[in-house]
Amino acid sequence: MNKANIFCTDTNMKVILFSEVSVGISANSILFISHLCMFLGESRPKPIDLYIAFFSLTHLMLLVTMGLIAVDMFMPGGRWDSTTCTFLMYLHIVLRGPTLCATCLLNVLWTITLSPRNSCLTKFKHKSPHHISGAFLFLCVLYMSLSSELLSITASLNLTSENFLYVSQSCSILPMSYSIKSMFSTKMAIREAFLIGLMVLSSGYMVALLWSHKKQAQHLHSNSLSLKASPEQRATRTIMLLMSFFVVFYILDSVIFYSRMKFKDDSIFVCVQIIVSHSYVTVSPFVFICTEKHIIKFFWSLCGRIVNI
């Protein structure tokens, strides 16, 4: 079977991919709308609400782009020209950068929010939402500018090439030259190592804070221990669960990617990698939705208002 045609013939992959994209778009939309409304509706808005809205928006954009590509994978008859193919593939690859930036900065921001008053991070607690949105946009633009080599990728309607990087019904994108590929891989490895290292440091700091807070609470309430977790503990567990999902899916994505490079004739790795690489952005909003009860209450009240109109 031609590798280019596996997307059209494998019904299981089609169902899994479209289900993943649909669920991810729905969950991220709920998270985005709820936190944006909470940020705009409060008299003293919390910066963390705005940033979680940014976090879900980047995931939403990535999944929408993937949905457009998936439609072209499975629907017969190519409809894209070379320009459309290049633009969507470039946009999809580049959007993975802001997703990583959003996860990293969310981790750092949560660490700052939960830090004690005597911490050196206290001075960053009262920064306005403009500083947060500005920092996020700056990192996104910087990340995208460092990916300028991707603009040189070639979109082609030739689906018979054995060296394709990505294939849909309309186009295949051929590999970059060795020099461009080496430069891009080096810069990508450096920035991903920096962002992941920052996440590891902030996660370790939060674990230390959680342990210290737990010991202090046990010492103060040794005679009447409460089984109810504090808001700080719940927030720390949420972000640690989020980081755990990120690490697991990142490792799986890397393993499948290198397996795909090794077994070039086994095109099933292409489909599996697409599904795994979008699993984190699909699962992550459920971490917030399931742990933050006010999101569920917000949507129940919103549905009640709509019914009463």
Curated annotation (Swiss-Prot):
Main location: membrane
GO cellular component, one term: plasma membrane
Side Cytoplasmic, residues: 42-50, 107-134, 214-237, 289-309
Subcellular location: Cell membrane
InterPro entries: GPCR_Rhodpsn_7TM, Vmron_rcpt_1
Cysteine pairings via disulfide bonds: C85-C171
Keyword list, A-Z: Cell membrane, Disulfide bond, G-protein coupled receptor, Glycoprotein, Membrane, Pheromone response, Receptor, Transducer, Transmembrane, Transmembrane helix
CDD domains given in the database record: 7tm_V1R_pheromone
TM region(s), chain numbering: 21-41, 51-71, 86-106, 135-155, 193-213, 238-258, 268-288
A molecular function GO annotation: pheromone receptor activity
Phenotype caused by lack of the gene: Mice lacking all but one V1ra and V1rb gene (12% of the V1r repertoire) show a lack of chemosensory response to a subset of known pheromonal ligands and changes in maternal aggression as well as male reproductive behavior.
Pfam (any one): V1R
SUPFAM superfamilies, sorted: Family A G protein-coupled receptor-like
Residue intervals on the Extracellular side: 1-20, 72-85, 156-192, 259-267
PROSITE patterns: G_PROTEIN_RECEP_F1_2 (PS50262)
GO BP annotations listed: response to pheromone; sensory perception of chemical stimulus
Signal peptide positions on this chain: none
Glycosylation sites: N158
Membrane topology annotation: Multi-pass membrane protein
Function: Putative pheromone receptor implicated in the regulation of social and reproductive behavior.
Protein family: Belongs to the G-protein coupled receptor 1 family.
PANTHER family linked to this entry: VOMERONASAL TYPE-1 RECEPTOR
Protein name: Vomeronasal type-1 receptor 46
The organism of origin for this protein: Mus musculus (Mouse)
Gene name for this UniProt entry: Vmn1r46
